[in-house]
Amino acid sequence: MINEQLFNLYASRIQGINALYADLDAKGIKDYAGPLLPYCWEQKYLESKFRLVIFGQETNGWYCDYMNTEEEISKNIGMYKDFRLGTYYNSLFWQYAHRFNMELNGIDDLNFVWMNVNKFGSDSGVGKPEQAVLDDEVKYYNLLAEELAILKPDVCLFLTGPNYDQDIARKLTDVEFHSLCEFGEREAVRLSSRYLPRHSYRTYHPGYGNRISETYQRILNAILSDCKSSN
């Protein structure tokens, strides 16, 4: 079962996250929230035409307690489950994520998985935490490749924008970025890595993409077409 495998992964890395906490405590760094640990509605996900994982940048606030017991891991995952993929939120990110899933799969009913490139975000505002937090995540708590191995997605869509390409590369060290159709490298790229499915793409975060909505929709349509034409 996917959720059991994810839980076992997180439980096996308690030592790593404790090392992260200890290092950040020693540096006096407290302004961070996370980690974001996903839950999968397994039957819906597995029965979808395309098993889809959509990536954001980092959470805007999240779990803020030390997460170093199995009980706290369960509590963290429960927060994700209760969030229900932003069902009760009307942000641009969730509007575009749900629309893409609907257009890809013909149904949008908790049947994709949401993750973030960075598991930790700032606790006091929006955006990345301090660089030391990002560095320690890579050093002590880089789980992305293992999460992908468990989820086995058919499509990965990174709605992260070009300024997060380096964050992706730090998590998946063999990743390469390739041109996609007629779009410039900042607009949209195809990603290749032994950890990623063939259909892996990065484009703008909806917060920016919606400002250039005509171009953004062309990009998303091109990605959808590429997924469907070579499935």
Regions found by a protein language model. Give the residues of each.
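C-terminal capping/extension of enzyme domains
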Residues: 1-12, 130-145, 164-231
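Beta-strand-turn-beta hairpins that frame and shape the catalytic cleft
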Residues: 47-52, 105-110, 190-201
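Short, contiguous, well-structured surface segments enriched in hydrophobic/aromatic residues
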Residues: 105-122
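Surface-exposed cleft-lining segments at the edges of enzyme active sites
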Residues: 76-90, 119-138
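Signature of the catalytic double-stranded beta-helix
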Residues: 78-108
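Proline-aspartate-enriched helix->loop->beta-strand connector
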Residues: 144-161
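Active-site and ligand/interface coordination hotspots across diverse enzymes
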Residues: 1-88, 143, 147, 187-191, ...
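Short, solvent-exposed loop/turn segments at secondary-structure junctions
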Residues: 58-62, 118-122, 161-165, 205-209
